[in-house]
């Protein structure tokens, strides 16, 4: 299968042991968020568990009444039997009420917990550095919000309550069975031993493959999303068959994992059920032997101690009848506990992945310089302003506690900058450049030369390994990242539009922009004409990343979005390399208007878009090998000249 850049591979889960520690964290979070409700739920479950046990115990009482009835007649025991039946009905009704209450409460707790968890996940994700998204595929990240959240939903709404209820019932039944007959209890212990072995071997293997199935499902979803996003590229290069082969490989892995998981899961419950049936038969047989012995083989029980003063006494039919009912109920609840293992293991894996996202270190920001609105006096003195003035300034704290204001001009300078995404593989070497306010700098070079990396450093998406970047004379590392990015505008080749109106998408560049400012930005970007021709103009709804617009129209909206922000520094990252030449003329006019009076960094594969730059930097393997104006570089007849004349190609 083809390797996909940016995706961090995950090790296969088969053979790995599940880490159940995240479940403890889930439970702690539940109690932190819903303590009162969970206490009420636990109380209801305890009552329901007790209610579930009592009928089996009442069978012993009713059977004793029936035995008395055989001697005394119906009239002698009818009152007792009717009283016992009414009591059992009341018990069942109480259990039904408690079950109804706790299921409703758990439904609220589950949805509330998932709502808060998704909020925490998304809030944390928004604070992550770009590096995280470069190293993890969108499909993997999306699976946190879908597959993993769904396993937690099943855990909280079903597995934990059922496990708690079944566990209480099992403990209660063991105590009562021990109370009624210790010899019969030995048979039950034999059953527990067998069930434990089956759970460990069959259930454990099933759990391993369920974990692997969950991982494989995430890979399948990630690959499908990747292919959907790149469908045009797949078709252009006629890679349909290759894509199918790659998909078949990961789909085959999913089939194998799911098949093994279901195979073990499907034999697990029948085995547990048959162990329960065998245990029932053995209990009935031993009980029959003890009864038929006529007291020669006495029953050892605490019930006898309380009733006769001695633990040894003949075994009664009523005790056997009650014990058989408890045995059946016991095996059913043990099976239910065992059945939850797969769900719990999958939920543990899902919780681990969710907490892995939540616990990711947020993007570090040690900056202390902020961007503020300012007013400028005739003598150039800057003062902080609470209203819009069109002037921005850097607010720089001084050692004596004062604040120095530096006008935002857009002067960007690199001094001996080195950088590497991977410490073993440097990307940039000794980059030094100067962009004065209003200048246009262009970066030219083959893919991987380091053009986009330079713009990533200006945005502080990544921090440099060595050297310095100065912005208006201020060390860029001293500027708060949000304020720094607020001063920058960016237009990318791959335009991202969001669900909402055209006006909303333009306003995304400046959330407090008025409609008039958005329309002015659209006019500046040459987008106004096509927008007014849309069905609802600026109120036209865009969905699916603006699928109802052409590539050129989407590009114009991206330019308008950058224009409304009115930043002093613009980054145009290959902004016209994916549209036709005719459309490029319209887009280029919009860009020229946008670039006017700003410091601009341009990355383009079409050299025609950078000829009017104040300086052109030719990069090769992370180094600036040529620099100068278009005319100067042509005259030097170096690499740029070779690119311009077609002797070399960028790609």
What are these model-derived regions, one by one?
Residues 33, 37-50, 91, 158-212, ...:
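Transmembrane helices of ABC transporter permease
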Residues 38-101, 178-183, 285, 292-317:
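Transmembrane helix-loop-helix hairpins at lipid-water interfaces of multipass membrane proteins
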Residues 69-70, 176-190, 260, 264-352, ...:
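Helix-loop-helix
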Residues 35, 130-131, 147-156, 160, ...:
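An intracellular "coupling" helix at the cytosolic face of ABC transporter transmembrane type-1 domains
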Residues 1-52, 67-87, 102-106, 110, ...:
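Membrane-integrated ABC transporters
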Residues 12-16, 51-67, 90-138, 142, ...:
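Juxtamembrane helix-loop junctions of ABC transporter transmembrane domains
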Residues 43, 98, 102, 110, ...:
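Hydrophobic alpha-helical transmembrane segments of ABC transporter permease domains
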Residues 74, 374-651:
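ABC-type nucleotide-binding domain
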């Amino acid at each position: 299968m083809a390797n996909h850049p940016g995706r961090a591979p995950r090790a296969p889960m088969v053979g790995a042991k599940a880490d159940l520690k995240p479940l403890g964290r889930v439970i702690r979070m539940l109690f932190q968020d819903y303590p009162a409700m969970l206490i009420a739920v636990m109380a209801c479950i305890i009552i329901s568990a007790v209610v579930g046990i009592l009928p089996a115990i009442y069978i012993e009482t009713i059977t004793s009444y029936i035995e008395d009835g055989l001697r005394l007649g119906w009239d002698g025991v009818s009152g007792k039997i009717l009283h016992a039946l009414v009591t059992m009905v009341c018990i069942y009704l109480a259990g039904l009420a408690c079950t109804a209450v706790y299921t409703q409460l758990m439904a609220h707790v589950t949805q509330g917990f998932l709502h808060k968890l998704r909020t925490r996940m998304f809030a944390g994700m928004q604070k992550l550095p770009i590096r995280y998204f470069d190293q993890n595929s969108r499909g993997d990240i999306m699976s946190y919000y879908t597959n993993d959240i769904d396993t937690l939903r099943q855990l909280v709404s079903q597995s934990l309550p059922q496990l708690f209820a079944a566990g209480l019932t099992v403990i209660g039944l063991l105590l009562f069975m021990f109370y009624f007959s210790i010899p019969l209890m030995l048979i039950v212990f034999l059953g527990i031993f067998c069930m434990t072995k089956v759970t460990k071997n069959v259930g454990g293997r099933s759990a391993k493959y369920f974990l692997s199935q969950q991982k494989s499902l995430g890979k399948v979803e990630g690959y499908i999303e990747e292919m959907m996003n790149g469908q045009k590229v797949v078709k252009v290069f006629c890679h349909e068959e290759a894509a199918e082969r790659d998909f078949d490989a990961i789909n085959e892995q999913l089939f194998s994992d799911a098949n093994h998981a279901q195979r073990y899961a499907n034999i697990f419950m029948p085995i547990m059920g048959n162990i329960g049936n065998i245990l029932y038969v053995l209990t009935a047989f031993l009980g029959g032997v003890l009864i038929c012995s006529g007291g020669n083989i006495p029953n050892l029980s605490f019930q006898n101690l309380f009733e006769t003063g001695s633990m040894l006494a003949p075994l009664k039919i009523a005790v056997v009848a009650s014990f058989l009912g408890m045995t059946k109920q016991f095996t059913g609840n043990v099976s239910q506990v065992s059945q939850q293992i797969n769900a719990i293991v999958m939920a543990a894996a899902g919780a681990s992945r969710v907490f892995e996202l939540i616990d990711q270190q947020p993007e570090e920001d040690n900056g202390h310089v902020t961007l503020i609105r300012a007013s400028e006096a005739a003598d150039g003195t800057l003062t902080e302003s609470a209203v819009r003035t069109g002037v921005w300034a850097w607010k720089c704290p001084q050692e004596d506690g004062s604040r120095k204001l530096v006008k935002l001009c857009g002067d960007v300078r690199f001094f001996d900058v080195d950088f590497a995404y991977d410490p073993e593989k440097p990307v940039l070497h000794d980059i030094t450049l100067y962009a004065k306010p209003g200048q246009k700098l262009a970066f030219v070079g083959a893919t991987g030369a380091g053009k986009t990396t330079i713009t990533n450093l200006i945005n502080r998406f990544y921090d440099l390994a060595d050297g310095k970047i100065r912005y208006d004379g201020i060390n860029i590392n001293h500027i708060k990242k949000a304020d720094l990015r607020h001063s920058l505008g960016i237009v990318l080749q791959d335009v991202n539009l969001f669900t909402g109106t055209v006006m909303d998408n333009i306003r995304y560049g400046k959330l407090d922009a008025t409609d008039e400012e958005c329309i002015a930005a659209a006019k500046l970007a040459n987008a106004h004409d096509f927008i007014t021709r849309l069905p609802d103009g600026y109120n036209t709804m865009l969905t699916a990343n603006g699928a109802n617009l052409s590539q050129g129209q989407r590009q114009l909206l991206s330019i308008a979005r950058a224009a409304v922000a009115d930043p002093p520094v613009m980054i145009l990252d290959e902004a016209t390399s994916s549209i036709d030449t005719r459309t490029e003329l319209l887009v280029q006019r919009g860009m020229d208007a946008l670039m006017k009076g700003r410091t601009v960094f341009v990355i383009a594969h079409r050299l025609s878009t950078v000829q009017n730059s104040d300086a052109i930097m030719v990069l090769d393997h992370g180094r600036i090998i040529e620099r100068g104006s278009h005319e100067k570089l042509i005259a030097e007849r170096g690499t740029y000249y070779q690119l311009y004349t077609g002797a070399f190609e960028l790609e």
